[in-house]
Curated annotation (Swiss-Prot):
This is Thiol peroxidase. It catalyses: a hydroperoxide + [thioredoxin]-dithiol = an alcohol + [thioredoxin]-disulfide + H2O. It comes from Streptococcus mutans serotype c (strain ATCC 700610 / UA159). Coiled coil: none annotated. Pfam families: Redoxin. Transmembrane segments: none annotated. Thiol-specific peroxidase that catalyzes the reduction of hydrogen peroxide and organic hydroperoxides to water and alcohols, respectively. Plays a role in cell protection against oxidative stress by detoxifying peroxides.
Length: 161
Protein backbone atom coordinates (compact mmCIF):
# COMPACT_ATOMS: atom_id res chain seq x y z
CA UNK A 1 0.00 0.00 0.00
CA UNK A 2 1.22 3.48 -0.87
CA UNK A 3 0.14 6.54 1.08
CA UNK A 4 0.51 10.31 0.89
CA UNK A 5 -0.01 12.01 4.25
CA UNK A 6 -1.62 8.77 5.43
CA UNK A 7 -4.15 8.65 2.58
CA UNK A 8 -4.01 5.66 0.23
CA UNK A 9 -2.96 6.51 -3.33
CA UNK A 10 -2.40 4.44 -6.46
CA UNK A 11 0.69 4.55 -8.63
CA UNK A 12 0.58 4.24 -12.41
CA UNK A 13 3.11 2.01 -14.10
CA UNK A 14 5.11 -1.01 -13.04
CA UNK A 15 7.73 -0.81 -10.31
CA UNK A 16 11.27 -1.53 -11.43
CA UNK A 17 13.66 -4.01 -9.80
CA UNK A 18 17.37 -4.09 -9.01
CA UNK A 19 19.09 -5.51 -12.09
CA UNK A 20 16.63 -3.94 -14.56
CA UNK A 21 17.91 -1.55 -17.17
CA UNK A 22 16.47 1.85 -16.33
CA UNK A 23 13.93 3.05 -18.90
CA UNK A 24 15.10 5.96 -21.01
CA UNK A 25 13.39 9.26 -20.39
CA UNK A 26 12.83 12.64 -21.97
CA UNK A 27 12.56 15.25 -19.23
CA UNK A 28 12.61 19.04 -19.29
CA UNK A 29 15.63 20.87 -17.87
CA UNK A 30 15.41 24.29 -16.23
CA UNK A 31 16.38 25.92 -19.55
CA UNK A 32 13.46 24.06 -21.23
CA UNK A 33 15.78 21.75 -23.17
CA UNK A 34 15.11 18.02 -23.17
CA UNK A 35 17.41 15.60 -21.33
CA UNK A 36 17.61 11.83 -21.71
CA UNK A 37 19.68 9.11 -20.07
CA UNK A 38 22.10 9.41 -23.00
CA UNK A 39 23.02 12.91 -21.77
CA UNK A 40 24.60 11.25 -18.73
CA UNK A 41 26.26 8.34 -20.57
CA UNK A 42 29.21 6.68 -18.87
CA UNK A 43 28.37 8.07 -15.44
CA UNK A 44 26.82 6.57 -12.34
CA UNK A 45 23.46 8.18 -11.76
CA UNK A 46 21.50 8.84 -8.59
CA UNK A 47 17.94 9.59 -9.66
CA UNK A 48 16.23 11.21 -6.71
CA UNK A 49 12.48 11.45 -7.31
CA UNK A 50 10.40 13.86 -5.23
CA UNK A 51 6.72 14.90 -5.25
CA UNK A 52 7.53 18.65 -5.15
CA UNK A 53 10.85 20.35 -4.60
CA UNK A 54 9.10 23.08 -2.58
CA UNK A 55 8.23 20.83 0.38
CA UNK A 56 10.36 20.14 3.44
CA UNK A 57 11.27 16.49 2.85
CA UNK A 58 11.83 17.03 -0.88
CA UNK A 59 14.04 20.03 -0.13
CA UNK A 60 16.07 18.00 2.38
CA UNK A 61 16.38 15.03 0.01
CA UNK A 62 17.57 17.20 -2.86
CA UNK A 63 20.09 19.06 -0.70
CA UNK A 64 21.45 15.92 0.95
CA UNK A 65 22.16 13.96 -2.21
CA UNK A 66 23.65 16.98 -3.99
CA UNK A 67 25.85 17.96 -1.05
CA UNK A 68 27.05 14.46 -0.18
CA UNK A 69 27.82 13.50 -3.77
CA UNK A 70 29.19 16.82 -5.04
CA UNK A 71 32.74 15.42 -5.15
CA UNK A 72 31.89 11.82 -6.10
CA UNK A 73 33.86 10.58 -9.08
CA UNK A 74 31.94 9.97 -12.29
CA UNK A 75 28.58 10.39 -10.54
CA UNK A 76 25.67 12.69 -11.29
CA UNK A 77 22.65 13.43 -9.10
CA UNK A 78 19.42 13.96 -11.04
CA UNK A 79 16.39 15.23 -9.15
CA UNK A 80 13.06 14.59 -10.88
CA UNK A 81 9.67 16.08 -10.02
CA UNK A 82 6.63 17.43 -11.85
CA UNK A 83 7.37 20.97 -10.71
CA UNK A 84 7.60 23.42 -13.57
CA UNK A 85 11.19 24.00 -14.73
CA UNK A 86 10.93 27.65 -13.64
CA UNK A 87 10.09 26.59 -10.07
CA UNK A 88 12.97 24.12 -10.08
CA UNK A 89 15.39 26.84 -11.26
CA UNK A 90 14.10 29.25 -8.60
CA UNK A 91 14.54 26.60 -5.89
CA UNK A 92 18.11 25.80 -7.01
CA UNK A 93 19.04 29.49 -6.91
CA UNK A 94 17.47 30.03 -3.48
CA UNK A 95 19.15 26.87 -2.14
CA UNK A 96 22.56 27.87 -3.50
CA UNK A 97 22.67 24.67 -5.57
CA UNK A 98 23.18 26.28 -8.94
CA UNK A 99 24.93 23.19 -10.33
CA UNK A 100 22.15 20.81 -9.26
CA UNK A 101 20.40 18.96 -12.07
CA UNK A 102 16.63 19.19 -11.68
CA UNK A 103 14.45 17.75 -14.42
CA UNK A 104 10.70 18.02 -14.81
CA UNK A 105 8.17 15.37 -15.85
CA UNK A 106 5.38 17.97 -16.04
CA UNK A 107 4.82 17.63 -19.78
CA UNK A 108 3.42 14.12 -20.15
CA UNK A 109 4.27 12.22 -16.96
CA UNK A 110 6.12 9.63 -19.08
CA UNK A 111 8.90 9.24 -16.51
CA UNK A 112 6.40 8.66 -13.71
CA UNK A 113 4.59 6.00 -15.73
CA UNK A 114 7.80 4.26 -16.89
CA UNK A 115 9.26 4.16 -13.37
CA UNK A 116 5.99 3.21 -11.62
CA UNK A 117 5.75 6.49 -9.73
CA UNK A 118 2.88 8.60 -11.06
CA UNK A 119 0.36 9.18 -8.26
CA UNK A 120 -2.95 8.94 -10.13
CA UNK A 121 -4.95 10.94 -7.62
CA UNK A 122 -2.53 13.87 -7.36
CA UNK A 123 -0.60 13.93 -10.65
CA UNK A 124 2.61 14.09 -8.62
CA UNK A 125 5.49 11.63 -8.55
CA UNK A 126 5.97 9.27 -5.65
CA UNK A 127 9.18 9.49 -3.65
CA UNK A 128 11.93 7.10 -4.74
CA UNK A 129 15.67 6.77 -5.21
CA UNK A 130 17.39 4.86 -8.00
CA UNK A 131 21.13 4.27 -8.31
CA UNK A 132 22.25 3.33 -11.82
CA UNK A 133 25.65 2.11 -12.93
CA UNK A 134 27.43 3.48 -16.00
CA UNK A 135 25.37 1.14 -18.21
CA UNK A 136 22.03 2.26 -16.70
CA UNK A 137 21.52 -0.96 -14.75
CA UNK A 138 19.68 -0.37 -11.49
CA UNK A 139 22.02 -1.30 -8.63
CA UNK A 140 19.87 0.12 -5.82
CA UNK A 141 16.32 1.37 -5.52
CA UNK A 142 13.88 2.44 -2.87
CA UNK A 143 10.19 3.14 -3.41
CA UNK A 144 8.78 4.76 -0.30
CA UNK A 145 5.44 3.48 0.99
CA UNK A 146 4.62 6.82 2.65
CA UNK A 147 5.47 9.73 0.38
CA UNK A 148 6.14 12.16 3.23
CA UNK A 149 8.93 9.99 4.72
CA UNK A 150 12.62 10.46 4.04
CA UNK A 151 14.44 7.85 1.97
CA UNK A 152 17.21 5.73 3.45
CA UNK A 153 20.01 8.16 2.60
CA UNK A 154 22.80 6.00 4.02
CA UNK A 155 21.82 2.94 1.97
CA UNK A 156 21.53 4.96 -1.24
CA UNK A 157 24.85 6.73 -0.66
CA UNK A 158 26.58 3.43 0.13
CA UNK A 159 25.27 2.01 -3.17
CA UNK A 160 27.09 4.75 -5.07
CA UNK A 161 30.49 3.98 -3.56
Amino acid sequence: MTTFNGNTVTLAGKKLQVGDTAPDFSLTDTDLSKKTLADFAGQKKVISVVPSIDTGVCDAQTRRFNQELSDADNTVVITVSVDLPFAQARWCGAAGLNDAITLSDYYDYSFGKAYGLLINELHLLGRAVFVLDEDNKITYLEYLDEMTNHPNYDAALAAVK
